[in-house]
């Protein structure tokens, strides 16, 4: 890797397979103890000069289902190249009338409705037990900065590009790949969910274990299946909304990345560095050298 390490990593969701309008400077293929990421990591140079890292969650050809995404490799690779912060994008369904297609949500909480088929911890199979603090699943300082940045950017848009911006919402993460039944969609509403997707977990948990600050930018594409007055969501509907929103998304992304990078570089964001050091229950002298080597890929104090 040439030049300065990227401080900010971007994980692109459905429809976001690269960063438009900025210069790619390098493509990296990173091997991790948990395999290779879902795509090469591309380093992009922002117009203001800094470099950011990007990978496509589902692969450049969208070949990984939500259950197949190699999230451990994705997070580990971004940590290895120097990222301290992850901004993740995801196409999501709305569970609330007031959260409309094309709106953006920066959630603050998650309800896990996955089915334990996705590897969800870096400690599995290593003879090591770690318990990450996860009461606030998204970094609160980072989500605050991202929300502020988006709201300020949106006020400068032309009227036909105006979108709603929502914060402090609850994301449901379901297994997929099929969409919800109407009954499930209504159940998630009763749970208190505001949006629904298939990707935020285990991504957010793994980011916490790797001591990376993590925020999700959720782009609303549909109303899921709870509205009896219309047909349930389809892939065609999702992709049509993404296509209609692509220019807005690109402008927002550049603004957000600049502001987040500057905040990290100036020490204005408290990062998650060191948060896992006292979250491991297993005595260090009882951990095998092989396991220490594996974990040191993301947590240097195992070296």
Swiss-Prot record:
Q: Sorted alphabetically, which keywords does the UniProt record give?
A: Cytoplasm, Glycosyltransferase, Nucleus, Purine salvage, Transferase
The stretch of residues making up the signal peptide is none
Q: Where in the cell is the protein located?
A: Cytoplasm; Nucleus
Q: Where, in this chain's numbering, is phosphate bound?
A: 14, 57-58, 90-91, 199
| Main localisation | cytoplasm
Q: Which InterPro entries match?
A: MTAP, Nucleoside_phosphorylase_d, Nucleoside_phosphorylase_sf, Purine_phosphorylase-2_CS
Q: Coiled-coil regions in this chain?
A: none
Describe the family membership recorded for this protein in Swiss-Prot or TrEMBL. Belongs to the PNP/MTAP phosphorylase family. MTAP subfamily.
NCBIfam families reported in the protein's UniProt record:
MTAP (TIGR01694)
The protein in question is named: S-methyl-5'-thioadenosine phosphorylase 1
Instruction: Give the source species.
Output: Puccinia graminis f. sp. tritici (strain CRL 75-36-700-3 / race SCCL) (Black stem rust fungus)
Q: What is the lineage of its organism?
A: Eukaryota, Fungi, Dikarya, Basidiomycota, Pucciniomycotina
């Amino acid at each position: 890797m040439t030049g300065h390490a990227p401080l900010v990593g971007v994980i692109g969701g459905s429809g976001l397979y690269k960063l438009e309008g900025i210069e790619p400077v390098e493509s990296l293929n990173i091997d991790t103890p948990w395999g290779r990421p879902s795509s090469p990591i591309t380093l992009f140079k922002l117009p203001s000069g800094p470099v950011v890292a990007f990978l496509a969650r589902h692969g450049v050809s969208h070949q990984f289902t939500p259950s197949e995404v190699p999230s451990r490799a994705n997070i580990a690779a971004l940590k290895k190249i120097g990222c301290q912060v992850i901004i993740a994008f995801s196409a999501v369904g709305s569970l609330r009338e007031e959260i409309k297609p094309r709106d953006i949500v920066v959630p603050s909480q998650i309800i896990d409705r996955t089915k334990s088929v996705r590897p969800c911890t870096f400690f599995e199979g290593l003879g090591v037990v770690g318990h990450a603090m996860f009461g606030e699943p998204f970094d609160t300082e980072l989500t605050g900065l991202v929300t502020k940045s988006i709201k300020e950017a949106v006020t400068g848009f032309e009227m036909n590009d105006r979108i709603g911006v929502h914060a402090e919402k609850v994301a449901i993460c379901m297994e997929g790949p099929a969409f919800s039944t109407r009954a499930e969609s209504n159940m998630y509403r009763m749970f208190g969910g505001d949006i629904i997707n298939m990707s935020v977990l285990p991504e957010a948990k793994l980011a916490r274990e790797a001591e990376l600050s993590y925020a999700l930018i959720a782009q609303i594409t549909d109303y899921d299946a709870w509205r009896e007055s219309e047909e349930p969501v389809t892939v065609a509907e999702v992709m049509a909304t993404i296509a209609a929103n692509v220019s807005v998304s690109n402008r927002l992304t550049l603004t957000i990345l600049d502001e987040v990078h500057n905040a990290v570089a100036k020490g204005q964001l408290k990062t998650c560095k060191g948060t896992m050091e006292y979250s491991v229950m297993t005595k260090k002298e009882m951990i095998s050298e092989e396991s220490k080597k594996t974990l040191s890929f993301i947590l240097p104090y195992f070296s």
